[in-house]
Amino acid sequence: MARRLWILSLLAVTLTVALAAPSQKSKRSVTVEQPSTSTNSDGNTTPSKNVTLSQGGSTTDGDEDYSGGDYDVLITDTDGGNHQQPQEKTDEHKGEHTKENEKTQ
């Protein structure tokens, strides 16, 4: 009887530890290096920024975890500040693509 109690308590401790451990997700990211300046259609020259695309994964710095199929864009300024901008399609953006697709058909 004591042996069964010992085995059950060992099993309970093992399950508790296994469930309490944080799950590890893989994090994928790609950094896109861009030229130092870019010129738009008006001829204006603007400094470019490095863009990092990342998907899923857990973070160790306390930032939110944007898991899922959409990519997040991390823009690194020249001053070293990071600004995370989730990519979201607006209704207006979707409407433009629908109109373009109708024109091509």
Curated annotation (Swiss-Prot):
Residues 86-105 have a biased composition (Basic and acidic residues). Residues 1-20 form the signal peptide. Pfam families: Cytomega_UL20A. Keywords: Glycoprotein, Signal, Virion. Residues 21-105 are annotated as: Disordered. Belongs to the HHV-5 UL22A protein family. This is Glycoprotein UL22A. One of its GO terms (cellular component) is virion component. Residues 29-55 have a biased composition (Polar residues). It is found in: Virion. Glycans are attached at residue 50.
